[in-house]
């Protein structure tokens, strides 16, 4: 089988390539160049120059062809610009979801198909055929599971993608990399947003859109002015740290009013929600569930999930979510992903 492997230069995707090559497949390595990095940014994140060279070295070690695909324009339009727009408009984006949906499993998958190949990545997730359809499942290692970022994959895509490390725990992946003689076997995992190479997300947004960043007031839910801020792009709903406010009780961001350049803060209870709407919903099966269904809902990657009822809106492009109990930090713009046991049912952007 011919398989195109998306190689980021990390241990997971390099091991995915090694496992597939070891099974005798015709493996082709490719790294996506998503941004123009300066020398100062080297080594900070995946897909930076040093990582491209790590991917190239892994491919050389495995004896497979290797290419670099320039996707800067598409990535800028579909991921970076949306990231900036969301932050300045008071939402909390999830660029990894956008990258997977709009670039990796769209543009790159199309290139793989043009070569008569499947597409493999180093994601920790699994795909299985059950009941006559393809199902997206959580990884065998719960601590590394990345299915949250993949909810946008439908039946068509799942038929042509492979997740070779999804059934392995991280130590086993590193052991396989060492066995294959890969220099990245002990390379640390990337923790940063891949295109934010200097500073944090707030600094990145301020540099990309300085004219759209406005200082403003930090106010209580009762309207009392408590302080000032440098821009709503530096905050997210549910945030506690970094508010710069004194007081006997902790305060959390309750909502962001970008139009008024106002950050509203309150108690943990006020920053929690048990009902919300989801927009831009997609369903792995290709069709929304009928009526109200009981599912586990994750409102961010590291969230264990909360039991709730999900009711798809007419047409399936949206959904109403009612949680069994309030959850703090249900941030507009973030992904809400729905699970039935170990199966990803679908997801969308929190309204």
UniProtKB/Swiss-Prot annotation:
One of its GO terms (molecular function) is tRNA-uridine 2-sulfurtransferase activity. It is found in: Cytoplasm. One of its GO terms (cellular component) is cytoplasm. It is an enzyme of class 2 (transferase). Disulfide bonds join 99-194. Residues 144-146 are annotated as: Interaction with tRNA. It holds the Pfam family tRNA_Me_trans. Keywords: ATP-binding, Cytoplasm, Disulfide bond, Nucleotide-binding, RNA-binding, Transferase, tRNA processing, tRNA-binding. InterPro entries: MnmA-like, MnmA-like_C, MnmA-like_central, MnmA-like_central_sf, Rossmann-like_a/b/a_fold. The active site is at 99 (nucleophile), 194 (cysteine persulfide intermediate). Its EC number is 2.8.1.13. It catalyses: S-sulfanyl-L-cysteinyl-[protein] + uridine(34) in tRNA + AH2 + ATP = 2-thiouridine(34) in tRNA + L-cysteinyl-[protein] + A + AMP + diphosphate + H(+). Its main location: cytoplasm. The record marks 123, 334 as: Interaction with tRNA. CDD domains: MnmA_TRMU-like (cd01998). ATP binds at residues 6-13, 32, 122. GO terms for biological process: tRNA wobble position uridine thiolation. Catalyzes the 2-thiolation of uridine at the wobble position (U34) of tRNA, leading to the formation of s(2)U34. NCBIfam families: PRK00143.1, trmU. Belongs to the MnmA/TRMU family. This is tRNA-specific 2-thiouridylase MnmA.
